[in-house]
């Protein structure tokens, strides 16, 4: 799988996905960096079949209306430390991989991973 980590999440998440054999980029790796628009992210996601990882619910509504981004992990943890967030993703990575094989939107909070669409 290929992942794109949104600007409001730590770059370190990319390392976690790469260590598991996936491709991963952070918004800071894109040409416009943090100035990349949501629309540009959606188009890139659709073109390259990227799973967007974000706290931004605008991506959820965009997916409902236009099926963009291609796939989405919606992070619903509120304020969480970087280390705790990385542990949460590491713990849930097998379930995330399995869910995204069949579904297009999953939601991750501190207690569970939910399939949304």
Description of each model-found segment:
Residues 27, 62, 116:
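Residues that scaffold the ATP/ADP-binding catalytic core of kinase and kinase-like folds
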Residues 25, 53, 73-75, 106:
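Hydrophobic/aromatic beta-strand patches that form the interior of the parallel beta-sheet core
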Residues 45-63:
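Acidic, metal-binding active-site segment of PIN/NYN-like and related structure-specific nucleases
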Residues 95-117:
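Charged phosphate-binding loop/patch that engages nucleotide di/tri-phosphates or the phosphate backbone
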Residues 60-89:
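Mid-chain, well-packed structural core segment of small domains
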Residues 19, 90-91, 95:
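Ribonuclease/tRNase effector modules and their secretory precursors
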